[in-house]
């Protein structure tokens, strides 16, 4: 494709709030934030229409944040994800062709929530993914099962039971 320049910043904050506010082994509150801001551009290319374009599959913004709350045998987790628009080809095609193979990947956000209960060696968990029920896609397949976009799953819920030996 050519030569590209990528630069930006990424940081992770993982903060145990309960250690700061409470003196309790039964209570836990943890916050995390993982954020990146990446600028990516082709600085030279022998191909027409590529120089100056954003590098494909490199979103400008990527953010994941969440909060975990634990009290005795109970735990809940809330996680939010945001991903900015990105391109799937070096020409930065915005509109999809008929095959769906080229074109941009629109921005999306996702909210997940789960609740757990621990007793002896068992963990019981109930949760939901994609609670905002927004439809998005993160890939454009050129072959199987495509060609075309691969949509995200719909809002879903789960129940699990785990036993630790």
Which positions does each model-derived feature cover?
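Flexible, active-site-adjacent loop/turn segments at secondary-structure boundaries
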Residues: 53-56, 85, 103-108, 129-130, ...
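Structural motif
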Residues: 70-71, 105, 118-119
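C-terminal beta-signal and adjacent terminal beta-strands/loops
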Residues: 29, 82-94, 116-165
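Extracellular loop and loop/strand-boundary signature of outer-membrane beta-barrel proteins
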Residues: 1, 47-54, 97-103, 144-149
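Transmembrane beta-barrel architecture of outer membranes
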Residues: 60-64, 110-112, 154-158
């Amino acid at each position: 494709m050519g030569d590209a320049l990528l630069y930006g910043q990424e940081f992770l904050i993982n903060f145990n709030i309960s250690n700061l506010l409470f003196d309790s082994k039964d209570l836990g509150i943890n916050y995390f934030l993982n954020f990146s801001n990446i600028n990516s551009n082709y600085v030279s290319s022998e191909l027409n229409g590529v120089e100056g374009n954003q590098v494909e599959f490199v979103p400008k913004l990527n953010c994941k944040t969440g909060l975990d709350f634990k009290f005795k045998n109970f735990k809940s987790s809330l996680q939010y994800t945001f991903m900015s628009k990105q391109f799937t080809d070096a020409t930065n095609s915005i509109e999809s062709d008929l095959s769906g193979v080229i074109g941009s990947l629109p921005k999306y956000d996702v909210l997940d929530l789960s609740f757990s209960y621990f007793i002896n060696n068992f963990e019981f968990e109930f949760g939901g993914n994609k609670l905002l029920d927004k439809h998005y896609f993160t890939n454009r397949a050129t072959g199987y099962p495509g060609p075309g976009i691969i949509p995200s799953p719909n809002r879903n819920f789960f129940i699990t039971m785990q036993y630790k030996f």
